[in-house]
Amino acid sequence: MSPITREERLERRIQDLYANDPQFAAAKPATAITAAIERPGLPLPQIIETVMTGYADRPALAQRSVEFVTDAGTGHTTLRLLPHFETISYGELWDRISALADVLSTEQTVKPGDRVCLLGFNSVDYATIDMTLARLGAVAVPLQTSAAITQLQPIVAETQPTMIAASVDALADATELALSGQTATRVLVFDHHRQVDAHRAAVESARERLAGSAVVETLAEAIARGDVPRGASAGSAPGTDVSDDSLALLIYTSGSTGAPKGAMYPRRNVATFWRKRTWFEGGYEPSITLNFMPMSHVMGRQILYGTLCNGGTAYFVAKSDLSTLFEDLALVRPTELTFVPRVWDMVFDEFQSEVDRRLVDGADRVALEAQVKAEIRNDVLGGRYTSALTGSAPISDEMKAWVEELLDMHLVEGYGSTEAGMILIDGAIRRPAVLDYKLVDVPDLGYFLTDRPHPRGELLVKTDSLFPGYYQRAEVTADVFDADGFYRTGDIMAEVGPEQFVYLDRRNNVLKLSQGEFVTVSKLEAVFGDSPLVRQIYIYGNSARAYLLAVIVPTQEALDAVPVEELKARLGDSLQEVAKAAGLQSYEIPRDFIIETTPWTLENGLLTGIRKLARPQLKKHYGELLEQIYTDLAHGQADELRSLRQSGADAPVLVTVCRAAAALLGGSASDVQPDAHFTDLGGDSLSALSFTNLLHEIFDIEVPVGVIVSPANDLQALADYVEAARKPGSSRPTFASVHGASNGQVTEVHAGDLSLDKFIDAATLAEAPRLPAANTQVRTVLLTGATGFLGRYLALEWLERMDLVDGKLICLVRAKSDTEARARLDKTFDSGDPELLAHYRALAGDHLEVLAGDKGEADLGLDRQTWQRLADTVDLIVDPAALVNHVLPYSQLFGPNALGTAELLRLALTSKIKPYSYTSTIGVADQIPPSAFTEDADIRVISATRAVDDSYANGYSNSKWAGEVLLREAHDLCGLPVAVFRCDMILADTTWAGQLNVPDMFTRMILSLAATGIAPGSFYELAADGARQRAHYDGLPVEFIAEAISTLGAQSQDGFHTYHVMNPYDDGIGLDEFVDWLNESGCPIQRIADYGDWLQRFETALRALPDRQRHSSLLPLLHNYRQPERPVRGSIAPTDRFRAAVQEAKIGPDKDIPHVGAPIIVKYVSDLRLLGLL
């Protein structure tokens, strides 16, 4: 028996709804009414009347019920939402429309052809007024509530409305528009409740300001004066004899290509909104919809009137900021899900948040995700949807796939425009709405019909609802039509099959972002080009994303002033300043950018002959890297949000608020300053809602959207708000609770801060000195960080040792489940070397246990029973795990690294005393005098106080220092045996193929040298006579380091031992010798005598590499090579203890610290080839 398809499941669900859901069944479209309104030539007012009278007894519109609450202290009355909706029938709605039409026509307020501006959010009142205007033959001019008053004033001046209808919340702006426009004789106020003090005050204020120029009246007052019998026919009401070609609606664009322009909709085009099956394939089933799109957007009108023409019920969200969206969805249980991509993003965010919130120790994430999806389907979305559509902007392939999996049905993708209506459904030409189409060449962007494998060009169309032009803009209208009357969509498409298209680009450098905003990149480039730090700038966007990226070539003065790594922050600040001065919107400011130090010229092909940006070449040159940034920001955002939800409350509030804003908006935490406003960082109302939810999840504090988007509140103010509302105390230590903080800022930390009692309970500490020692014959080892480069070799080393004693290696691996943790670890050994994989599998079969956990979490992220088992059975803890990040501050690395070490210490001090092998970094030396930095010195003495700043790797080094301090404290408490291994560069081994630490600097260097085939005459400063100087490169092979850590760690059954795991020799083996060895091995590398010439050629060659190579090259770290290095002879710190211990234990093939030899360097090339990078 074949499996049931999605389509079959949908059909069964629809049948079940008809049988068991009375509301669904009662909303079925009436065939007779549908046929009546589909009659060709039926005027718009008659269509509306046919629907209203035909479905008179059905519920038409619905809004949230409210109650009025009076504050006992102030006496002020406000609204409170109730958890249910109240409806108005079609008949009642028609009575309201008729009464209002009677008043407006009788009093000559609105005549056929008059323009009426509407300012407010979609609601029962808004819909009533809008349909009344259609009945009267007037022209509706919906205004964008999100637009600034200065953007609306030109529209009012151009349309000269006789009336302005405004919600009470927008009344102040409407008053300004009425005063400046001077043509409106009436301001009609809707969504007004006379019981609410603020509403009455708003009306009184408007009446005072407009006294003598315009009448201010509420909708309720106007309808009450209407003199129309219930159920009256339209008859000969004004507007019934108006031509179908007469203007009925003006939809103003956002003005990205200049001043806002109004797309004209004649009555026949507006009528298509009421004939749902002409634009929506799901128009045959009952329509119960939740309406949240504004009426200034075509999609908002299609949803509302498509619902009514089907005899359905249109519900309205309770709040325009969509803060009640999920609550409203659950109450309404819509049959149609017509969302823009940003709302699908919100559903996905809700899913992720719920999964992260519930994910507990040992939980099966796959099963949990399936459960949460089911709950969202049934409890949030209502479980009775029969169609789903996304439109207004492109949706990413990844999001579409997730939505379809969530809904268990196909997600229809609609593509159209304000001017032409629906054009494509799922990429296919929408027939019969599209009468004709064609692609035309766009030579200036490099798109041609002769392109292979598919023709590419701008899509031009003729449709049955094509607009006649822009209001009072004849020249602009002429520009958007060709000589044959085809409308230029401005969209570049590839025709991948007969009448099947894929969107590629915007012709006029106008991008529509995923939230529906248009941005003109050429205008933005001109604005940002005014920055004194910017020489050239290329703005890049993807319509599936909500924000922009950029590539910036700084001025030479800017490059000379500060290092490149410091320049990014300055450039970011400059862009913000220029944007503020130019009055740009937040979405017009690039969220991230690449710094390019080589100017674009005619010679390198990145400028055109008239010195304009060569956009196709720039996109080809940077496009994949920029798309990777989008991907990285998205992935990083998910990881950071998960981290914030799990441990954000443990950090200082300001730090977490900044991190949360950066994570939510896709930025870098280091670039977010406390004085930044959320909207300045690219936030809007939807993302502000997500921010509200995130802060609540982190702090259990409600921060209203209004507080977040208020111009008076920067991130510091938001943090202050949280601080004021937050209950004191925390169940886990935090950076602030351990090191103290002043307004979240710490400039130095002290070893004395890191006392064990701040991390470990008193009972454990009191018992520790009396505990027995672990078994000196190590049979059970706990290893962290096993998937890391060093960690995997430690895992292999300890598996081999456990094989000799029939012991067990327990690896703690970050993953959703133990199964996924094991899979992660297995994958690290599957590098293309079958012998390695077989060796690992043979050992792992009997001696490996993998647990999903995290050293930075409470109880290591394990259930209590498992944690106690480890406390009882583990003989040795080997801890190379760390969050290695050379940019994040100590405050952000405190949790995973310092607190993580404390969590392992608590395990080490429970049940029995377990020796602890700790991998540190030689970087802890950066704040210690060289003479004091020895292997036997107490870190608490030689580095009692450390600076906390933004210098390179400051946070990472401090976090490892903190771990060493805690280990010293534990040793003093109970004699905990400790071995600390301070490592420098860890190089590849010579045994196993394909095992490389691809992201590290050294691997990038070898790949870049081999791929470009050029190297400098010397990487080091030359001697006075121009000769190469003797130099030493400090690195050791990973196999040797793993053996040393394992051997010396196992031997450390008492005492505290510190080892500098470094290459101490003044052997004249450095980077120059590595190049010699590569040449001798048959990897040709040309020497460029002048270092500057080499660097320039090297960078150019790296940028020309194929994407995968370029991404793994030295390019992102090239700033470290701007000048030749100063040669170092020998190691930077003493290694006497380490070398003596190695010699005594006979570690390694030389029974001594090894030199770096040619086989190691040459093997890098063969391994890179094996991995497909060379």
Curated annotation (Swiss-Prot):
Keyword annotations:
ATP-binding, Fatty acid metabolism, Lipid metabolism, NADP, Nucleotide-binding, Oxidoreductase, Phosphopantetheine, Phosphoprotein
Q: Does the keyword RNA-binding apply?
A: no
**SMART domains noted in UniProt:** PKS_PP
**What region holds the Carrier domain?**
651-726
Locate the residues binding AMP.
Answer: 297, 392, 413-414, 418, 491, 503-506, 512, 612
Catalytic activity, EC: 1.2.1.-
**Annotated InterPro entries:** ACP-like_sf, AMP-binding_CS, AMP-dep_synth/lig_dom, ANL_N_sf, CAR, Far_NAD-bd, NAD(P)-bd_dom_sf, PKS_PP-bd
Activity vs pH? Optimum pH is 7.5.
Report the temperature dependence from the record: Displays in vitro half-lives of 73, 70, and 48 hours at 26, 30, and 37 degrees Celsius, respectively, indicating it is a relatively stable enzyme.
Q: Which cofactor does it need?
A: pantetheine 4'-phosphate
Q: The organism sits in which domain of life?
A: Bacteria
The biological processes this protein is annotated with in GO are: biosynthetic process
Q: Name the SUPFAM superfamilies on file.
A: Acetyl-CoA synthetase-like (SSF56801), ACP-like (SSF47336), NAD(P)-binding Rossmann-fold domains (SSF51735)
Record-listed NADP(+) binding positions = 787-791, 814, 824, 854-855, 880-882, 919-920, 956, 960
Q: Which HAMAP family match?
A: Carbox_acid_reduct
User: Which family does the record assign?
Assistant: Belongs to the ATP-dependent AMP-binding enzyme family. Carboxylic acid reductase subfamily.
- Protein name per UniProt: Carboxylic acid reductase
Where does this protein come from, organism-wise?
Mycobacterium marinum (strain ATCC BAA-535 / M)
